[in-house]
Amino acid sequence: MSINDKPIGFFDSGVGGISVLKEAFKLLPKEDFLYYGDSKNTPYGTKKVEEVKALTFNATDFLMSKGIKALVVACNTATSVTINDLRENYDIPIIGIEPALKPAVELKKGGKIIIMATPMTLAEKKFANLMDLYKETEDIEPLPCPGLPELIEQGIVSGDVIYNYLKDKFSKYDDEKISSIVLGCTHYPFVEETLKEVTHNKACIIDGSFGTSRELKRQLKNSNMLREENRVGKVTIFNSREDKDIIDLSYKLFNMK
């Protein structure tokens, strides 16, 4: 098999990275994708750094054994703590994801920029460096959201539980002007509609899925690794939980409009 015909690997701590996979499949419809969700060990956002590194390398080894030509780490937490180590150890294009703060700043709407993310993403040096670029000129507030990925892993993406969780998180901003909300975890796009409801649709909601997918395409094109033939690609999903329910949920989220 030529390298062009090999699949692209995707990895996340659970089902969240499927939000990125959806964007990538739209952008690269001829490609085959292998997605590995580590729902058995989710969430990563409250774990120790070394544990996240070990789990990420285990997942990468699994996907490498399937013959992938590139890897997307579709997990903000795993990107923040392991992306450099991965690139040093594997000789394929490796693309990560980080909170899309730059697009939020470039909107120039005025008002507060809120970054929803896991506690670990917000605690890492990579995030601090990102904040340093803009904190002198912008009103940016990190908002840790522990527990939200676990709800989404159960398939709870709307309804009272999600509404009340988000309402509680955002109630302190009721009297403030919010220009944008950056979704700093790949699970969060699945609750975007409820988030709009809670914030009365007054803020732009931004996630990094499109930017990551565009970077994937750019790197594959520059390396002459894109599939050329006229075909429709396929998506195959694996999960460390190895039960039908989580696989069914994964495909349901992938096909969700």
Curated annotation (Swiss-Prot):
Gene3D superfamilies: 3.40.50.1860. The active site is at 75 (proton donor/acceptor), 185 (proton donor/acceptor). Pathway: Cell wall biogenesis; peptidoglycan biosynthesis. GO terms for molecular function: glutamate racemase activity. It is an enzyme of class 5 (isomerase). Substrate binds at residues 12-13, 44-45, 76-77, 186-187. Provides the (R)-glutamate required for cell wall biosynthesis. This is Glutamate racemase. The lineage of its organism: Bacteria, Bacillati, Bacillota, Clostridia, Eubacteriales. The gene is murI.
